[in-house]
């Protein structure tokens, strides 16, 4: 992909753990590579299809100096986060933040941290069977947007019977396709935080829930940890999930089963 490179932008700020760093300040140096398609900007001379690097450098300087953080990791992360928010056309970003005056009391050229993030497509299943179910789904989607997660597509809302053997009210279910620069684990933590904010209490396994947010796919990632399994292990067993998925992404291929969603849906429906 095409790349814009910004190298060694110098800024003065008051980041650091030591009191002297927060009182006296020091020099920091930022370099970054931003990846996006430059075709429209190059052929149509359209600045809106590009990143105005002069404005971006000014924004970085403003953002960098408006707070005093203990860790350069925090500052670098915030620069990446706000750049993605301000420039939706950027698909990937690698940013290095150097701290050449780091107080280590040894001969040193610089210390630096590098944060590398790439936008990914993910699918999230939403469900609710308590209160105003459709309103709960809408609130969850609004909270995703508020966190900078771009909603690409929304399936229709389905009324479905509960899954898992616990007697309870029917569900309103939906699947959304999103674009996010958050890694899978961070995206999961975001979903759990939204559930908590909306009042979900985990008492009965597969029991009634005000809101349920399940991470189904993140691109073609296959992942198994104590906290997260990708793809979601029950996708091929849940007709309501497949029905919603095939509505918005029928040709998406399950990375383990190697079948498009529409085939999995047709097979389970039979």
From Swiss-Prot:
Pfam families: FolB, HPPK. The active site is at 99 (proton donor/acceptor). CDD domains: DHNA_DHNTPE, HPPK. The keyword Nucleotide-binding applies. Residues 1-119 are annotated as: DHNA. Signal peptide: none annotated. Mg(2+) 1 binds at residues 212, 214. InterPro entries: Dihydroneopterin_aldolase, FolB_dom, GTP-CH-I_C/QueF, Hppk, Hppk_sf. Residues 120-270 are annotated as: HPPK. Gene3D superfamilies: 3.30.1130.10, 7,8-Dihydro-6-hydroxymethylpterin-pyrophosphokinase HPPK. ATP binds at residues 160-163, 171-173, 192-195, 200-215, 227-233, 238-240. Keywords: ATP-binding, Folate biosynthesis, Kinase, Lyase, Magnesium, Metal-binding, Multifunctional enzyme, Nucleotide-binding, Transferase. Substrate binds at residues 21, 53, 72-73. It catalyses: 7,8-dihydroneopterin = 6-hydroxymethyl-7,8-dihydropterin + glycolaldehyde; 6-hydroxymethyl-7,8-dihydropterin + ATP = (7,8-dihydropterin-6-yl)methyl diphosphate + AMP + H(+). One of its GO terms (biological process) is folic acid biosynthetic process. Catalyzes two sequential steps of tetrahydrofolate biosynthesis, the conversion of 7,8-dihydroneopterin to 6-hydroxymethyl-7,8-dihydropterin diphosphate. In the N-terminal section; belongs to the DHNA family. In the C-terminal section; belongs to the HPPK family. Homooctamer. This is Bifunctional folate synthesis protein. It comes from Streptococcus pneumoniae (strain ATCC BAA-255 / R6). The gene is sulD.
């Amino acid at each position: 992909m095409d790349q814009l490179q910004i190298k060694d932008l110098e800024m003065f700020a008051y980041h650091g753990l030591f009191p002297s760093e927060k009182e006296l300040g020091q020099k920091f140096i930022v370099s970054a590579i931003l990846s996006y398609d430059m075709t429209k900007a190059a052929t149509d001379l359209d600045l809106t299809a590009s990143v105005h690097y002069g404005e971006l450098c000014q924004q970085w300087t403003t953002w960098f100096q408006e707070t005093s953080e203990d860790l350069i990791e925090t500052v670098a992360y915030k620069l990446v986060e706000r750049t993605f928010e301000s420039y939706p056309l950027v698909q990937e970003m690698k940013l290095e933040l150097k701290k050449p005056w780091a107080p280590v009391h040894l001969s040193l050229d610089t210390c630096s941290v590098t944060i590398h993030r790439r936008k990914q497509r993910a699918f999230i299943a939403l469900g609710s069977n308590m209160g105003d179910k459709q309103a709960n789904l809408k609130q969850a989607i609004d909270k995703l947007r508020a966190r900078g997660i771009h909603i690409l597509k929304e399936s229709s809302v389905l009324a479905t019977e509960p899954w898992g053997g616990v007697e309870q009210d029917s569900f309103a279910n939906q699947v959304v396709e999103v674009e996010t620069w958050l890694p899978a684990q961070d995206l999961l933590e975001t979903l759990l935080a939204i559930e908590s904010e909306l009042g979900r209490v985990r008492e009965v396994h597969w029991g009634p829930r005000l809101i349920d947010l399940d991470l189904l796919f993140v691109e073609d990632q296959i992942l198994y940890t104590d906290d997260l399994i990708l793809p979601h292990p029950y996708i091929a067993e849940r007709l309501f999930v497949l029905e919603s998925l095939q509505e918005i992404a029928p040709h998406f291929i399950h990375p383990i089963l190697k079948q498009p969603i529409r085939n999995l849906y047709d097979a389970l429906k039979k």
